Amino acid sequence: MTVNLTELDAHEQPSDQMRAIWKSYSRADKEELLLNGAIDDLEKPEKAAEFVVAGTVPAATLTKGFAFLGSGFDAAASDAPIYYHPLLPGLLIFPSIVPLEVQKTLLSKLIHRDLSVPAHQTNMHLHYELPYVERKPTDGEGEPEDCRQSFFSHSPDSPVRFQPKDPDVHKPLSMKQVMDRRLHWVTLGGQYDWTNRVYPEEEPPKFPPDVAGFLETVFPDTIAQAAIVNFYTPGDTMMMHRDVSEETDKGLVSLSLGCDGLFMIAPSDIGKMSEEERPEDVKKQYLLLRLRSGDAIYMIKESRYAWHGVPKVLKGTCPEALEDWPAEDGRFEEWRGWMKNKRINLNVRQMRE
């Protein structure tokens, strides 16, 4: 697929048809969805038969990538399979590529550490002053470095508040209100301008090198320059959109942690494609993938500019081993169970060549 990047409009909307389909899934009952056969689930044999094996990620590559995040992880036991669907051969799917212990480490780095960096903008920054935790170098002795400035250092009923920039418009928010429902995203590296849909020209904050090392080992064709970490609670959604603000067509990486999410994706030209123009083995107009904790997708080729969104997060699907996070090793006990009701999605891209 050849794409003229200058012709892509970040403000363009999906077709009315795609929006209507997305909306129907967002409103559908979870149990009904799980039974009606609409979901493309690689763990269901009848659905898995529609997918094609694209290759594997060698176990040695995975082990090398995990080592960037810390020591002590078990070596990857086997190569990780990669799949695609004929509708979108450039949408590469990596089921269960991130083991649970590595998932926990990623959560700690992204939420304890990176969320606590003032240069990393969040959806809260527009209207609120964030109560960052300031600690002296001697504080937190014996505590992991990634945890020392975590917002979870405040208890859920802490008197600390997110103070509004304009008290006439917004009310102060408690730590529990923000961490449970009001925090929706944080950006790493390049800080995207959501109003103008562009990346600023000034030098961005440094992308976390350990996370970058992991990603670039497993997905070597994409340099990790910018990311958005999405915080979903069941009931939250992401509208259909295309990622077209980058000045390169390098692939997008997406990692899922926590509750399962339904990921809807459709070719960018699907509304213009007649049935005769579609590949003979493709009857679908879109995919509705069930992405589980530890799954990754890599959007390249024609899928790089495909319409995609998240119509539903499936309540009650967080792996049991993650449910209690961030409570572990005697820390953050008052927040035990926070992750049980969350889906964290790390979306990574290269801004420029």
Swiss-Prot record:
GO terms for molecular function: dioxygenase activity; metal ion binding. The lineage of its organism: Eukaryota, Fungi, Dikarya, Ascomycota, Pezizomycotina. One of its GO terms (biological process) is DNA repair. Disruption phenotype: Does not seem to affect growth nor conidiation. Displays milder disease lesions on rice leaves. Keywords: Cytoplasm, Dioxygenase, DNA damage, DNA repair, Iron, Metal-binding, Oxidoreductase, Virulence. Residues 223-352 form the Fe2OG dioxygenase domain. It comes from Pyricularia oryzae (strain 70-15 / ATCC MYA-4617 / FGSC 8958) (Rice blast fungus). The gene is ALKB1. The keyword Transferase does not apply. GO terms for cellular component: cytosol; nucleus; P-body. This is N6-methyladenosine RNA demethylase ALKB1.
